[in-house]
Amino acid sequence: MNSIEFPLLDQTVQNSVFSTTLNDLSNWSRLSSLWPLLYGTSCCFIEFASLIGSRFDFDRYGLVPRSSPRQADLILTAGTVTMKMAPSLVRLYEQMPEPKYVIAMGACTITGGMFSTDSYSTVRGVDKLIPVDVYLPGCPPKPEAVIDAITKLRKKISREIYEDRIRSQQANRCFTTNHKFHVGRSMNTGNYDQGFLYQPPSTSEIPTETFLK
């Protein structure tokens, strides 16, 4: 088509047609439609709840909290994760459809926090269970920091290639529900070594002079 013969038509086409890739179009469509699954276990989640109010208004980012992992594409872990909760967290993550993302919020989620030194039941970092996209340190992080983490995640989504992401997740999985948990022998059987228990002497063994004094 000759642009000299049809100047108005050529101008209209230039203003209404754009070329892109299917991958970029998919990333652009997901930027403002993140549906988070809120996994809060302690005080960090209270800071995230502040985003619901009118002061921060996280609806402008397209965040729609979901209660089902099958409808969510973002899981936000906030708080301490224990060994007993680890299989449930992994199951929730595996039930989310692809592509899916993870934000680790707070020191307890990232490293175990103050419980990492003397607690045998605390997971030292949620990235040992599921792959993390954005780390959000703090104890607890402020709502402004949560918004900054969501902004960084949106930038990451806009630049990613879907095939590379799937390949990296399959190679870097640290924990799956297919692992076999060995059930150890219970210690709370009631059969304790009597030698370690304090047994007060019976009254018949105490001399009578002790009572007369």
Curated annotation (Swiss-Prot):
It catalyses: a plastoquinone + NADH + (n+1) H(+)(in) = a plastoquinol + NAD(+) + n H(+)(out); a plastoquinone + NADPH + (n+1) H(+)(in) = a plastoquinol + NADP(+) + n H(+)(out). One of its GO terms (cellular component) is respiratory chain complex I. Transmembrane segments: none annotated. Keywords: 4Fe-4S, Chloroplast, Iron, Iron-sulfur, Membrane, Metal-binding, NAD, NADP, Plastid, Plastoquinone, Quinone, Thylakoid, Translocase, Transport. Pfam families: Oxidored_q6. Its EC number is 7.1.1.-. Signal peptide: none annotated. It is found in: Plastid, Chloroplast thylakoid membrane. Binds 1 [4Fe-4S] cluster. Its main location: plastid. [4Fe-4S] cluster binds at C43, C44, C108, C139. It is a peripheral membrane protein. One of its GO terms (biological process) is photosynthesis, light reaction. Its cofactor is [4Fe-4S] cluster. GO terms for molecular function: 4 iron, 4 sulfur cluster binding; iron ion binding; NADH dehydrogenase (ubiquinone) activity; quinone binding. Belongs to the complex I 20 kDa subunit family. NDH is composed of at least 16 different subunits, 5 of which are encoded in the nucleus. NDH shuttles electrons from NAD(P)H:plastoquinone, via FMN and iron-sulfur (Fe-S) centers, to quinones in the photosynthetic chain and possibly in a chloroplast respiratory chain. The immediate electron acceptor for the enzyme in this species is believed to be plastoquinone. Couples the redox reaction to proton translocation, and thus conserves the redox energy in a proton gradient. This is NAD(P)H-quinone oxidoreductase subunit K, chloroplastic. The gene is ndhK.
